[in-house]
Amino acid sequence: MCIRDRLKPSEKSPLSAIRLGELALEAGLPPGALQILPGFGQTAGAALAAHLDVDCIAFTGSTATGKSVMQAAAQSNLKRVSLECGGKSPNIVMADFDDLDRVARTAAYAIFFNQGEMCSAGSRLLVQESIREPLLELSLIHI
């Protein structure tokens, strides 16, 4: 039996996963043990979910896509599936916080850490209206 890990990153942010593959090789992981498969979910992701030689799928993303992954897994070889679907945690920012640059910097880090693929990624900011514009300007700098 040959166990390999295949990683299909989000098509919106594949570079960190590609770099992870490079680092794995540099660290001594045998070639082919970790395969990075960039591509679109509707093609590359669907092919992985339906492939008979894939025994397990772990998916993080939308609820609609999670349902498709589960269906493809069930219709192929009834592979094990782990889903993290839906919600992302918002950050709430009130006007009495005095360091908006820190908020912008931290929010930019939080959303892109781990390619944003976790339920606590903080992909939304709920901001008191009086600080909306200055925080938006600072956020654009840090993204």
Task: Report each predicted region and the residues it spans.
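Conserved small/polar residues in nucleotide/adenosyl-binding loops
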Residues: M1-D5, I141-I143
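Conserved small-residue-rich beta-alpha loop and adjacent elements
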Residues: R4-G32
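Short beta->alpha connector loops at strand-helix junctions that form conserved
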Residues: K8-S10, P38, T60, M94-A95
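Short alpha-helical
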Residues: K12-L15, Q42-T43, A64-T65, D98
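Hydrophobic/aromatic residues within well-ordered alpha-helical segments
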Residues: S13-S16, F40, I131, L135
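ALDH superfamily catalytic-core signature
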Residues: G28, A50-H51, C56, T63-I141
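A structured beta-alpha segment of the ubiquitous adenosine-cofactor-binding alpha/beta core
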Residues: I36-D55
